[in-house]
């Protein structure tokens, strides 16, 4: 019930349409139930008695019932489609908006392939189930109840067969649903793996081709596809028993009614049961059993959708690990940064801390260089500044205020970060750059690109800043992508600029030009540069050396060459490589 309550919030403006669907269905059912009654009267009062006026009367009423049922059926179908499609639209929107609220820690819990599956396949399953619930799950019970009443009014004795058939079907359906649900849960988890394989293959197609690993990728895809096939086979193998069980009950009931009904007509001389009544009873029997069949289909669909609904609610229930305090500050005073005894872990485990007791002061407008090996905690350190994660212990202060006391939107608006993985979106270069500032003028865009050394190569494109960037930026080089991302960050005009190894694909000459532009054009901005090349940070006001989540050394280029063994080793290895 809790899942239903949470999902029902997404109905919203489609609530009235969802209510009107069952209302139309009730009228549709009433007119359909009257049809066998009219047929019985046509046979007994019209055809058997040779009464033409009765035949015309009941024939006309029969046609009117059919037409009325058809009209209400069309209305209910249209309303149902509108309600279910609208519900699915709102559900996807609610999930997507919820994901936008996630912190990095929340996002780390779900793979992108899993989120895509939940937004597409799972929502479609829930949409189909909702459609069946407000239409068939309403229609079938009403039809069943009215048909049972009409059948018992026609012949109580013969209708007793339904009291045997219905429990048999109910027990069988319960067993089928409970056993198949386990496999449906598993199959949707495997769908996540399938999407992951497809996503990795498509985004890494150039790597696959360059290493001639097509066969390996095909085998990997086939393996996951086979797993889905086998799991679905198990689930559908159980569900497949539903139809034979239904048919057995239907044919058994029909045989019983025809045999004993015919005997009653013959033995009683049509005083206990007439031919018309037997005809209507058979029609009611078909209606009752078809309703049971529809209900069984609904139960199977709901069973499948239940697994999807649980996965959707996981997304909706996930609360962001980052929240504003009660009265957050709406201003960042300056670009000074202070780390006070900061420790940090991606998981709540003190033994697996990736940052330990970090103490660091970065004056506003200064340039800090960060050097260190892979996994030393460089990226983790800078991700705490815009509060992408919260510290485990200690505090990070910007402009003298704890980042947890500053409004998240305000904080991130004053910190521009170019991540290790450079991301460009589908659209023109100009549209991508305006992610940094949607109000940026063409002159501001060009100026930012000049600082990032992106303008020279953009001018070589036929459409220049209106050049379309393919998905993932596949039609620009790695270095070009990095420079566009730096330009985008500069358009924010931030108080703090963080480059997380963002010039690794840029040649040393261009790298030097970018650093010179920063020094000359944005002297008041605090600049943090993570790099593998010492040449990228040697002009910084201060350089820190990270090792094992700790600051191993801190000072200028000259100081670290004299005092820090790790820095000296990196410098010597790079200078020897340059000499060779």
PLM regions: where:
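Short intracellular "coupling" helices and adjacent cytoplasmic loop segments at the cytosolic face
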Residues: 49, 85, 93-123, 196-220, ...
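An intracellular "coupling" helix at the cytosolic face of ABC transporter transmembrane type-1 domains
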Residues: 13-16, 101-105, 121-134, 138, ...
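Alpha-helical transmembrane segments of multi-pass membrane proteins
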Residues: 16-18, 65-84, 135-142, 163-190, ...
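ABC-type nucleotide-binding domain
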Residues: 331-580
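Helix-loop-helix
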Residues: 51-57, 150-164, 234-310, 315-316
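Juxtamembrane helix-loop junctions of ABC transporter transmembrane domains
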Residues: 23-24, 31-44, 65-112, 116, ...
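Transmembrane helix-loop-helix hairpins at lipid-water interfaces of multipass membrane proteins
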Residues: 3, 12, 18-75, 79, ...
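Hydrophobic alpha-helical transmembrane segments of ABC transporter permease domains
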Residues: 12, 23, 27, 31, ...
């Amino acid at each position: 019930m809790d899942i239903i309550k949470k999902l029902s919030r997404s109905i919203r403006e489609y609530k009235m349409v969802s209510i009107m669907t069952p209302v139309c269905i009730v009228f549709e059912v009433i007119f359909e139930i009257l049809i066998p009654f009219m047929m019985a009267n046509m046979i007994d009062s019209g055809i058997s008695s040779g009464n033409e006026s009765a035949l015309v009367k009941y024939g006309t009423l029969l046609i009117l019932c059919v037409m009325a049922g058809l009209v209400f059926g069309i209305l209910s179908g249209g309303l149902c489609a509108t309600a279910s499609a609208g519900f699915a639209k709102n559900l996807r929107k609610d999930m997507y908006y919820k994901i936008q609220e996630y912190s990095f820690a929340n996002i780390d819990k779900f793979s992108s392939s899993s989120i895509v599956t939940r937004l597409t396949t799972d929502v479609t399953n829930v949409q189909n189930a909702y459609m069946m619930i407000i239409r068939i799950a309403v229609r079938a019970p009403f039809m069943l109840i009215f048909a049972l009443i009409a059948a018992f009014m026609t012949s109580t004795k013969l209708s007793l067969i339904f009291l045997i058939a219905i429990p048999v079907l109910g027990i069988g359906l319960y067993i089928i649903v409970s056993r198949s649900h386990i496999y449906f849960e598993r199959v949707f988890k495997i769908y996540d793996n399938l999407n992951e394989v497809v996503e990795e293959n498509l985004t890494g197609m150039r790597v696959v081709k360059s290493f001639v690993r097509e066969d390996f990728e095909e085998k990997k895809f086939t393996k996951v596809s086979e797993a889905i096939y086998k799991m679905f086979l198990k689930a559908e193998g159980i569900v497949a028993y539903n139809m034979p069980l239904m048919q057995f009950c239907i044919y058994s009931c029909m045989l019983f009614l025809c045999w004993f009904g015919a005997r009653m007509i013959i033995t009683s001389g049509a005083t206990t049961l007439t031919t018309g009544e037997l005809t209507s009873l058979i029609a009611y029997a078909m209606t009752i059993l078809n309703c049971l069949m529809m209900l069984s289909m609904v139960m199977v669909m709901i069973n499948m959708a239940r697994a999807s609904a649980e996965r959707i609610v996981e997304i909706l229930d996930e609360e962001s690990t980052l929240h504003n305090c009660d009265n957050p500050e709406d201003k960042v005073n300056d670009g000074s940064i202070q780390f006070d005894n900061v420790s940090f872990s991606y998981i709540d485990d003190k033994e697996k801390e990736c940052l330990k007791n970090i103490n660091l002061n970065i004056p506003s407008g200064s340039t800090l260089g960060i050097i260190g090996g892979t996994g030393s905690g460089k990226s983790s350190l800078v991700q705490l500044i815009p509060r992408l994660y919260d510290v485990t212990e200690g505090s990070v202060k910007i402009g003298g205020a704890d980042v947890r006391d500053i409004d998240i939107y305000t904080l991130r608006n004053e910190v521009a970060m170019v991540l290790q993985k450079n991301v460009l979106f589908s659209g023109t270069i100009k549209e991508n750059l305006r992610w940094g500032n949607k109000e940026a003028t063409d002159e501001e865009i060009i100026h930012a690109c000049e600082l990032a050394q992106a303008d020279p190569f953009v001018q070589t494109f036929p459409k220049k800043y209106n050049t379309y960037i393919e998905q993932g930026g596949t039609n620009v080089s790695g270095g070009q992508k990095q420079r566009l991302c730096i330009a985008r960050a500069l358009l924010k005009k931030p108080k703090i600029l963080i480059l997380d190894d963002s010039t690794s694909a840029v040649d040393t000459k261009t790298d030097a030009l970018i650093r010179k532009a920063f020094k000359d054009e944005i002297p008041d901005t605090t600049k943090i540069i993570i790099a593998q090349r010492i040449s990228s940070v040697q002009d910084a006001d201060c350089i820190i050396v990270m090792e094992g989540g700790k600051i191993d050394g801190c000072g200028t280029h000259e100081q670290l060459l004299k005092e820090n063994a790790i820095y000296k080793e990196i410098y010597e290895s790079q200078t020897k490589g340059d000499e060779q």
